[in-house]
């Protein structure tokens, strides 16, 4: 009789139900995703600096293993802005305002960047997993329910117009989680 190894469980620190649903859709059933909301103050810095700080503080608060995520939307014409501050830009100016930022520029290209940080617990060196998807910024199309999905176009469709499974295969988040899955699989072998 062969027994399989117990399924790996991660404690994903988020209060965003859309992010949680995407992470669960990509990782489960291979990796069980539990969720916990913590109020973590985000430092200002690069995406990597923000993620490292967040994962270290989350591991200390939870006193155990955690997974955190930070996302950027980088406009090439604006040398990477809004970058890691996209959440605050979205809350302040919305889809139309983000499009207006690029109104004076011919270049509408952008990068969607997702960085997950995993820590085995307090004092453990965090590991980062990053995914990038190239696209462009367009006027909003599709349901406006998940951040900037309605204005980020990849190969003719905005994220918001895509089927969820299709989006998860090509998205910045999906690419980062693929790296996380590979890392966990390598550690089991």
UniProtKB/Swiss-Prot annotation:
Enzyme Commission number(s) from the entry: 3.6.1.66
Organism: Pyricularia oryzae (strain 70-15 / ATCC MYA-4617 / FGSC 8958)
UniProt-annotated binding residues for ITP: 14-19, 54, 70-71, 87, 146-149, 167, 172-173
Protein name: Inosine triphosphate pyrophosphatase
Function text: Pyrophosphatase that hydrolyzes non-canonical purine nucleotides such as inosine triphosphate (ITP), deoxyinosine triphosphate (dITP) or xanthosine 5'-triphosphate (XTP) to their respective monophosphate derivatives. The enzyme does not distinguish between the deoxy- and ribose forms. Probably excludes non-canonical purines from RNA and DNA precursor pools, thus preventing their incorporation into RNA and DNA and avoiding chromosomal lesions.
Family, per entry: Belongs to the HAM1 NTPase family.
Keyword Iron: no
One MF term in the entry's GO annotations: nucleotide binding
């Amino acid at each position: 009789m062969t027994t399989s190894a117990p399924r790996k469980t991660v404690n994903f620190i988020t209060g965003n139900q859309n992010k949680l649903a995407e992470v669960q859709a990509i990782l489960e059933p291979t990796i069980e995703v539990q969720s916990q909301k913590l109020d973590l103050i985000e430092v200002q810095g690069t995406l990597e600096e923000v993620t490292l700080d967040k994962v270290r503080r989350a591991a200390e608060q939870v006193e155990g293993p955690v997974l955190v995520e930070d996302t950027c939307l980088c406009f090439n014409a604006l040398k990477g802005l809004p970058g890691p501050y996209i959440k605050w830009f979205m809350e302040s100016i919305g889809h139309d305002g983000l499009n207006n930022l690029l109104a004076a520029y011919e270049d509408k290209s952008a990068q969607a960047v997702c960085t997950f940080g995993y820590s085995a617990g307090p004092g453990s060196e965090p590991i980062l997993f990053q995914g990038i998807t190239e696209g462009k910024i367009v006027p909003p199309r599709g349901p406006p329910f998940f951040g900037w999905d309605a204005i980020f176009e990849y190969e003719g469709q905005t994220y918001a117009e895509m089927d969820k499974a299709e989006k998860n295969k090509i998205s910045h988040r999906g690419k980062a989680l693929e790296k996380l899955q590979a890392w966990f699989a390598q550690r089991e072998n």
